[in-house]
Amino acid sequence: MAVFHDQLNRVISLPAVPKRIISVVPSQTELLFYLGLDTEVIGITKFCIHPEHKFKAVTKVGGTKQLNINQIKAMQPDLIIANKEENERRQIEELIGVCPVWISDIHNLDSALDMIQSVGTLINRGVEAKTLCADILSRFDKLILPILNQRVAYFIWRKPYMVAGRDTFIDSMLQKCGLINASEADRYPEVTAQGLLLAKPDVIFLSSEPYPFRQKHIDEFKEILPNAKVILVDGEMFSWYGSRLLYAPAYFNELMYNVTLN
C-alpha cells in the first residue's frame, strides 16, 4: 500500500498505481494528459476543454461545481483528483467515500509546481513531472518584467462585478507581471462601480473566464474609469496551474508590452 499526502495534508493510500482516474479540475486534467495518461483518465468535467481531442473522447461527469455523483460512483474510479477551491466541499466529501481523492490547494507558482510533482509521483509519472516543473521554472526565471507600480483590477465576473483579490493564484500571476492588485480584499470579492472608482486602478483586465468578457464590455468599464487601460486577457494564462504554465511567461511578456505601449 503506497501512502501519499495531498495539499490539504490528507493521507491518501493507494493499493496500486491508479488505472481509472477521474479529474474534476480543467488545468489538472490537461496536466494528466500531458504526462501521458492517455487511457487511465476515464472521466473529466465539461470544462476540461484541453486537449481538445481528449475533451471530445472522454466521458463527462458534470461541471466542476455540479458533479454527477451517481455517475462517478457507477464508473468505479480508483482515484479522483480535485481542488479545494474549484470543487464544492460537500460533493468532494461525498466522493471521499467512493475512492481515494487527492485534493490540490494552489495559491502561487510554488504550490502549482508542488502539485505537478506530487500528482506525477501519485500516478507513476514522477520523472516526467520533474522535467515539466524544471521547464516551467526555467521559463518563469527568464520572465523579467519591470515593476510598473501600476494598479490592476482583474475582473472574473459581471452582474455582479467580481475581481480576483489577494491570496489567489491569479494575484500571484499579476505579481509576476510586475503589477499591483488594486483589490485589498482576499479571494474573489464583489465590487461596485463606486468601489472601482475608489480603488483607482490604472489598468483593468477583463478575463475570458469564468465570465466570457468580450470587446463589447470594454466601453462599459471605460464609462466608469475613462482614463484606465481596459484590456481583454486570456484567463487560462492567469488561472490554469498545470502544464499550461509552460505558455504563461511568453504570454505575459507580450501582454505587458501592450500595457506599456498603450
Predicted regions: what is each one?
Residues 1-262:
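N-terminal ligand-binding lobe of clamshell/alpha-beta domains
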